[in-house]
Amino acid sequence: GSDLAVAAEKAGLEFGDRGIFHRMPAGERGAGPVFSMANMLKPGSFDMARIEHLETPGVTLFMALPGPLPALDAWDTVLPTAQRLAELLDGNLLDEKRGALGRQGIAHIRDQLRAWDRQQESAKPRGMR
C-alpha cells in the first residue's frame, strides 16, 4: 500500500480527483490529466487514510482522449511511467488482455495512437491545423 503511494510519487504522479493518481501536464493545470492510475480492484480509488493496509493485484494506467497532449505524446509519458512503476514495485507490464506487454504490443499501441492523432488533425478546420 504505502509502497505504491511512494512509487507513484517517485514516478511523477499526484494523488487527486476521484481518489486516484494523475500525471498532470507541465504548466497547464486546468487542462486535466495526461493520464491517470487507478486500483485494479473496484471501485478503483485509493483510500489514502488506509493506504498502508492496501493490498491489490495491480493498477491500471489510462488516458482519456482527447487530452491536454496529442495521444502519441501522452503515450510517450505513460510508457516510461509504467516501466518505472513496474521497476519500483517489482511488477510486470500487462496489456488490456492481461498478457505481457512487449515490443510488438507497444508498437501496436503507438500505431493506434498515431492514427488517432492523424484523424484528429484532419478533422480540424483548415485554419486551426
State where each predicted segment sits.
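Well-ordered alpha/beta subsegment
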Residues: T60-R129
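Short, highly charged
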Residues: G1-A49
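Active-site-adjacent structural patch at catalytic or cofactor/ligand-binding sites
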Residues: F35-P43, E52-G67
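Short, low-complexity, polar/charged sequence segments that are solvent-exposed and flexible
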Residues: E9-G12, L54-G58, L79-R84
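Glutamate identity and glutamate-enriched acidic tracts
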Residues: E9, E28, E52-E55, E87, ...
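Alpha-helix boundary/interfacial micro-motifs
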Residues: R18-G19, E28-R29, F35, E55, ...
